[in-house]
């Protein structure tokens, strides 16, 4: 039977990513696998905002640090024995499949999909699509056309995210 030993889950603070994270926790527990929770701050966005907001980098890093800390706590409390977190700066489309997958020796990458429409995907592409195309290992994209009505995020709550929004 095929088992996964090192699962990488990409999170970005969206409810879709948290839904995928919950599934990654289940897969990690079933396989007794290491779970690496990653967040990549898109440096292209960062460079365009730097001129307008000198604190953007610090806010982004604090958001990501707290997000990853929350996910690590949830996974550990759910029974995942080996949970690591990684924060990177750069293009998520390149860093996740080409750098992080190798760095953590992932044999499965999991991610959510944000539900971009066809025009948006054509213009900006999707991170999940890039991961599928460039990954050296299996990829599971958790599709969610619409989150279940009873879904309540534990980490990426609206209240959590509002702490980091510009006022």
Swiss-Prot record:
It holds the Pfam family Usp. One of its GO terms (cellular component) is cytoplasm. It is found in: Cytoplasm. InterPro entries: Rossmann-like_a/b/a_fold (IPR014729), Universal_stress_UspA (IPR006015), UspA (IPR006016). Its main location: cytoplasm. Keywords: Cytoplasm. Gene3D superfamilies: HUPs. Belongs to the universal stress protein A family. This is Putative universal stress protein SSP1056. It comes from Staphylococcus saprophyticus subsp. saprophyticus (strain ATCC 15305 / DSM 20229 / NCIMB 8711 / NCTC 7292 / S-41).
